């Protein structure tokens, strides 16, 4: 799995757990809805850490909670 795919999968999982839409996340985080959509759809090769931090603030989690997922285990990520 590529890193952008892991970020996408984790974001989808967190949105689903919170019954939150991309629009609601945009309203809470300030990250443009188009950017959130591009992250979810793996349209970006990479995502700035600052954007992930803003998303985490909108999700009301800290950044370590975002990355605390099997998606980010070394064995699951391609080099």
What are these regions, as identified by a protein language model?
Residues 15, 26, 56:
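The alpha-helix within a helix-turn-helix
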Residues 1-21:
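A short, Lys/Arg-rich alpha-helix, primarily the initiator
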Residues 16, 30, 41, 71:
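Residue-level detection of the helix-turn-helix DNA-binding "recognition helix"
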Residues 19-38:
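Short alpha-helical DNA-recognition segment
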Residues 43-54:
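Short, basic-rich loop-to-helix N-cap that marks the start of a DNA-contacting helix
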Residues 38, 67-79:
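Short, charged recognition helix plus adjacent turn
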């Amino acid at each position: 799995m590529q890193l952008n795919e892991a970020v996408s999968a984790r974001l989808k999982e967190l949105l689903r757990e919170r019954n939150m839409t991309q629009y609601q996340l945009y309203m809470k985080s300030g990250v443009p809805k188009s950017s959130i959509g591009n992250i979810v759809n793996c349209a970006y090769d990479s995502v700035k850490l600052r954007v992930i931090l803003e998303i985490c603030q909108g999700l009301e989690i800290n950044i370590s909670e975002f990355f605390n997922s099997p998606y980010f285990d070394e064995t699951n990520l391609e080099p």
